[in-house]
């Protein structure tokens, strides 16, 4: 027998019937055993109907035993009697008549009643229950159950049982006031009503980006139908939202899906008052279409064209283009309605309308300023999502954050609970070691602490009830910061001091470049104070000048001062992009090429860390096409990668370093320490470098840069400071080996003298330290002349470096 359509409870009833037959020692399963199985199952509609008729398990069992008695012999196999088989067939027929796609316990009981001649029917009659009365009881329970379980509470539900089991009735949910209010979408809802009122092809499809409120428009229509704010033609319509996943789920055999969908369509056609809403309309394409079977879209096409089926679809622009537009026959049956992202003002109104729901859920109050901040900050900083969805999510998470914060146990209560646990453990230990006096004393302490805990907890909860937690602008800003990594919360005093002293912080790393340090510090302050142009990067700079004067070092120092770690800087070495074909690696390989799925080396890094210092080192080494890519980054703070995603550069500091003009300077000997007039020297050098820059880069590229900074040549006084910095780095490395080092002024001057080079800036100093300090120390360490815990002094005697060691003083 086929039990595939039987519900779990119905299958349980048949299993219980078999158990009853075995218990009573009968060789066959008859109608009486099925009746016993129905009453023993206890939870289905059939069991409830029998209980309502006053028929309990014991009552029926006694009557069955008195009618047919107990058997003696047990056979190996047990079969259904012809009457029992007929009952199961009739139960399937009853399910079909009621329009149900399943066979439940109620259908089995109706089959028993309809059979009318078996032992079960005699049992019911003997217990004073007429078959007609039993049938009425089942149908009554079945009707109330359908009304309660389906979304709608209207009389038309009986006409659409399959649809009710697969779809949600939005009009019924709207009637219960369970839908969120729909604000500012009257124009789109009006367009939907106009299309629905057409004679044929009355199927609107809502097309828009994810999160702009497409589903909300269908909910808005349901609310208008309930409020009688629609034309006569749409009065008393039911908006049912159908999930294609539910329709496909459980269709194990070929033809089941088509049968289910045809039933839904027949019910809609017969009811005549159903508007079907299919969210994610593109799921129609291919749904249920395996191995030559036709899919859902092809089954629906004829009804959609003739106007027999009113359907509202919703899908994104990308999915519409990818799936619907490819099928011209399906596309012509739908009328597209564009749903645009609401403006900032409209989004604020939407959030104000939703405020009550979120306040009730989180038990907090949300200020007007918080709503405004949620919309404006999400619009500015969360660029890869759409309003109002992203602003609603901000409010939701901020509400959750504030609510959880008020539930945190205060520290004094935690401390008391900890003490109470310790005293309990001590008391138990004292009892076990039979120190009863100590245990009695500890018991008194425990009692006192328990009272303190209860009092503290009570006062905390009372205070909690009186406090009305509030979601403020700061809470919204904190959530934005946690999402994006961009600091938008109110500036703390410690950060204020840091921002005001940024020049000093940078000067401690970069020596002799006042102009560059001041320009960068000003850009950071401008951004953090909220005064920068919101449509452009925080700052874009070109650092020019001879090699070894601190161009890259300043970018590293800036990253460390802002993020606390110079490794958080995004560094792209432009010498890797010298060939024309390599430029595409910045934004990602085009389709069909290796690396398409990996994303761009620049765009992916900025997507992951939108608030960062981006260093494009040695920019003049790159292919000229790279500068064309950078034009829109510099002007609009955005760049589109190979997959069409827009990457936001508005919270980055863009630094490009270049050695343009260095060769010209070398020829003219402008770099050095022998020129008397330093100001004139720098001015001449700047003019030369700017001339070279204009020849190397196109005007539209140079014109978009915020500031072009020409680094000064290093002076002799700077070299000693740089030696001190480099020796500090050596000190850190030696500290790991439990050693400390000190360079005397004479040693520093000697290193500076050895590392002076008129053309190469500070890098020769690094080589001088390697040669005269690090090499000497490594030899002494290997010889065993320097031991752990010693303090090393590097000095100069008779023009030579000498290493002295002493015991380290703490």
UniProtKB/Swiss-Prot annotation:
Q: Residue ranges of the Clp R domain?
A: 3-144
Q: Which GO terms describe its molecular function?
A: ATP binding; ATP hydrolysis activity
Q: Which UniProt keywords apply?
A: ATP-binding, Chaperone, Competence, Nucleotide-binding, Repeat, Repressor, Transcription, Transcription regulation
Positions of the region I? 163-410
Top-level taxon in the UniProt lineage: Bacteria
Query: Where are the residues of the annotated region Repeat 1?
Result: 6-71
Kindly list the biological process annotations in GO that this record carries. establishment of competence for transformation
Short name of any one Pfam family annotated for the protein: ClpB_D2-small
**Domain (UVR) ranges:** 417-452
What function is annotated for this protein?
Competence gene repressor; required for cell growth at high temperature. Negative regulator of comK expression. May interact with MecA to negatively regulate comK.
Q: Which family does it belong to?
A: Belongs to the ClpA/ClpB family. ClpC subfamily.
Entries under PANTHER family matching the protein: ATP-DEPENDENT CLP PROTEASE, HEAT SHOCK PROTEIN 104
Q: What is this protein called?
A: Negative regulator of genetic competence ClpC/MecB
**Lineage summary:** Bacteria, Bacillati, Bacillota, Bacilli, Bacillales
Please name the gene that encodes this protein.
Answer: clpC
């Amino acid at each position: 027998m086929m039990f595939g359509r039987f519900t779990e409870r119905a299958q349980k009833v048949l299993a219980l019937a078999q158990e009853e037959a075995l218990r009573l020692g009968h060789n066959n399963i008859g109608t009486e055993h099925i009746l016993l199985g129905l009453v023993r199952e206890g939870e289905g509609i059939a069991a409830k109907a029998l209980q309502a008729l006053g028929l309990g398990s014991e009552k029926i069992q006694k009557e069955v035993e008195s009618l047919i008695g107990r058997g003696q012999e047990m056979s190996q196999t047990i079969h259904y009697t012809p009457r029992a088989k007929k009952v199961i067939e009739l139960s399937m027929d009853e399910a079909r008549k009621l329009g149900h796609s399943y066979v439940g316990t109620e259908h089995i009981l109706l089959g028993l009643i309809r059979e009318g001649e078996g032992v079960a029917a005699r049992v019911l009659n003997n217990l004073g229950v007429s078959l007609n009365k039993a049938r009425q009881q089942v149908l009554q329970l079945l009707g109330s159950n359908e009304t309660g379980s389906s979304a709608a509470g209207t009389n038309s539900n009986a006409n659409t049982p399959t649809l009710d089991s697969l779809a949600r009735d939005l009009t019924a949910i709207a009637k219960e006031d369970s839908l969120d209010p729909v604000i500012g979408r009257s124009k789109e809802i009006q367009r939907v009503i106009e299309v629905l009122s057409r004679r044929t092809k009355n199927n609107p499809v809502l097309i828009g980006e994810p999160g702009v409120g497409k589903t909300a428009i269908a909910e808005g229509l349901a609310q208008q139908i309930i409020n009688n704010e629609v034309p006569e033609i749409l009065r008393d319509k039911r908006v049912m939202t159908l999930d294609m996943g539910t329709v496909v789920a459980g269709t194990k055999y070929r033809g089941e899906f088509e049968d289910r969908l045809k039933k839904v369509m027949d019910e809609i056609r017969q009811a005549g008052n159903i508007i079907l809403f299919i969210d994610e309309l593109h799921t129609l394409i291919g749904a249920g279409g395996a191995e030559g079977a036709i899919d859902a879209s092809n089954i629906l096409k004829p009804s959609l064209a003739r106007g027999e089926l009113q359907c509202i679809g919703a899908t994104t622009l990308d999915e519409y283009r990818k799936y619907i537009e490819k099928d011209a026959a399906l596309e012509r049956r739908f009328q597209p309605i564009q749903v645009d992202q609401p403006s900032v003002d409209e989004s604020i109104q939407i959030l104000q309308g939703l405020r009550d729901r979120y306040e009730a859920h989180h038990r907090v109050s949300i200020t007007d300023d918080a709503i405004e901040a949620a919309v404006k900050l999400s619009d500015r900083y969360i660029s890869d999502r759409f309003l109002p969805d992203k602003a609603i999510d901000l409010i939701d998470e901020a509400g959750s954050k504030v609510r959880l914060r008020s539930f945190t146990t205060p520290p004094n209560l935690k401390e008391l609970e900890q003490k109470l646990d310790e005293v309990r453990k001590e008391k138990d230990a004292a009892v076990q070691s039979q120190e009863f006096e100590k245990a009695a004393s500890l018991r008194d302490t425990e009692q006192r602490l328990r009272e303190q805990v209860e009092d503290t907890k009570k006062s905390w909860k009372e205070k909690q009830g009186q406090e009305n937690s509030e979601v403020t602008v700061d809470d919204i800003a904190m959530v934005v910061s946690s999402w994006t990594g961009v600091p938008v919360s109110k500036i703390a005093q410690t950060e204020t001091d840091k921002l005001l002293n940024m020049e000093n912080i940078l000067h401690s790393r970069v020596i002799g470049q006042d102009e560059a340090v001041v320009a960068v510090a000003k850009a950071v302050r401008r951004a953090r104070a909220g005064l920068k142009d919101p449509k452009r990067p925080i700052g874009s700079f070109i650092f020019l000048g001879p090699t070894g004067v601190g161009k890259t070092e300043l970018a590293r120092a800036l990253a460390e001062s802002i993020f606390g770690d110079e490794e958080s800087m995004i560094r792209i070495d432009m010498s890797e992009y010298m060939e024309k074909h390599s430029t595409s690696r910045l934004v990602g390989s085009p389709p069909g090429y290796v690396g398409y799925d990996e994303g761009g080396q620049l765009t992916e890094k900025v997507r992951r860390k939108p608030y960062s210092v981006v260093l494009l080192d040695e920019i003049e080494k790159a292919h000229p096409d790279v500068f064309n890519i950078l034009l829109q980054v510099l002007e609009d703070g955005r760049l589109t990668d190979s997959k069409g995603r827009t990457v936001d550069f508005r919270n980055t500091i863009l630094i490009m370093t270049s050695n343009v003009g260095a060769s010209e300077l070398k020829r003219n000997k402008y770099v050095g320490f022998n020129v008397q007039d330093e100001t004139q020297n720098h001015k001449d050098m700047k003019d030369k470098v700017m001339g070279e820059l204009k020849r190397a880069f196109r005007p539209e590229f140079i014109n978009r840069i915020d500031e072009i900074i020409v680094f000064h040549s290093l002076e002799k006084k700077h070299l000693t400071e740089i030696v001190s910095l480099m020796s500090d780095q050596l000190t850190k490395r030696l500290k790991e080996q439990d050693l400390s080092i000190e360079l005397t002024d004479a040693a520093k001057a000697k290193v500076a003298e050895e590392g002076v080079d008129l053309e190469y800036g500070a890098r020769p100093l690094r080589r001088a330290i390697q040669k005269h300090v690090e090499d000497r120390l490594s030899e002494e360490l290997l010889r065993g002349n320097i031991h752990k815990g010693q303090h090393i002094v590097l000095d100069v005697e008779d023009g030579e470096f000498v290493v002295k060691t002493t015991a380290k003083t703490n």
